[in-house]
Amino acid sequence: MRGKFPAGRCGASAAPAVAKGAVEMAVRVHLVAMLVAAGLMLGGCARQSPQPSAPGAGAGPVIGGLGKSIHPFWDQVEKGMRDAAEPRGIQVEFYVPTKEDARKQAEKIKSWVAVGVSGILFAASDPETVGPAIRDAAARRIPCVAMDTDAPDSGRLAYVGTDNYEAGKVAGRVLGDLLKGRGKVCIATGSLTASNSLERIRGFREVLTKEYPGITVLPEVLVDNEDRAVAEQKAKAKIAAEPDLAAFFGVYALNGPACANAVKSAGKQGKIRVVCFDTTAEHMNMLKSGMIDAAVGQRPYLMGKKGLELVALIIEKGPEQALREMGAKDGSIDTGVDVVRREDVEKYRARLKQLGIPVEGW
């Protein structure tokens, strides 16, 4: 099932993606049973996706997908993975902790390594905590690809997702123009350890400092560890503490809606602006109602789809050829972003549908 790579390298060459023969079928039966057991051990604190189908139903290689928290963003990533996996005869086990928890992520990776999954597509909440588990997987010749948030020192073979530094700059310009170059801004995020959050904040601050000197970005960043209740409470407290606050910048998917709800509760909708990342159904509905002013839409479905396609291709052909065929640049595949304002919602929806990306709830 797993590609047989030369010692010391993860993915220099590979066995066929779908193994044949009675011996390997027995191995598959054993693997799926162990995956089920591993899932049960970790299931009390996380949303565990349905287990792979029985080997008799056409079982193939198993690829683990690791998200960061329970949220519709990760539902889209999972769907992208499963849509790419089905025609390839690949099984997907997708796992997210209830909220950001790098320790639980590392435990899950270790369980996948123990049962010998064929590949791993992961988003590390804290690369320092998750990195050792990924390095161990790589040492055992399991191809690992980072998605959404990069972990370049982890031993991963590639990154699939947003160029977060550039996307942060995009968000900064959107908010700078919205405020006409003046005002006080607060940043809210789910993490100050994940690289995607840090890179977005870096790009955002850099643009406002250089291009919008009349805007003040408050030094304190609100951090909620992707806990919605905490995010709203901290945003409400900041509104009370800063009566002249002009805007929130929501770095993670839950931050925009959380800040928007806090603004509405304070009776300051239209006075305090909200610019944020991501375009789930909740974001789109808040854009339509005016609670969110603009969203920088990532493409989570494509992260899952392209990420799985890349892992599968690495298993089949090795990393160098796989990255070349997937059009990677410097080991990365940029899935891009879209800026969506209230007037863009229906056009954006039509574009997603045309691309075959699921659109539900808005």
Where in the sequence are the language-model features?
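Short, low-complexity disordered leader/linker segments with a strong preference
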Residues: 1-62, 135-142, 361-362
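Exported/periplasmic ABC-transporter solute-binding proteins
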Residues: 246-250, 260-329, 333-336, 340-347
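Hinge/cleft segment of the Venus flytrap/periplasmic-binding protein
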Residues: 45, 54-59, 195-196, 207-209, ...
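Hydrophobic alpha-helical
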Residues: 113, 122-138, 204, 219, ...
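Loop/turn elements at helix/coil->beta-strand transitions in domains of secreted/extracellular proteins
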Residues: 90, 116-119, 140-144, 155, ...
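Flexible loop/hinge segments that line or gate small-molecule binding clefts
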Residues: 127-166, 174-177, 184, 190, ...
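Short, hydrophobic alpha-helical segments
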Residues: 113, 175-180, 239, 307, ...
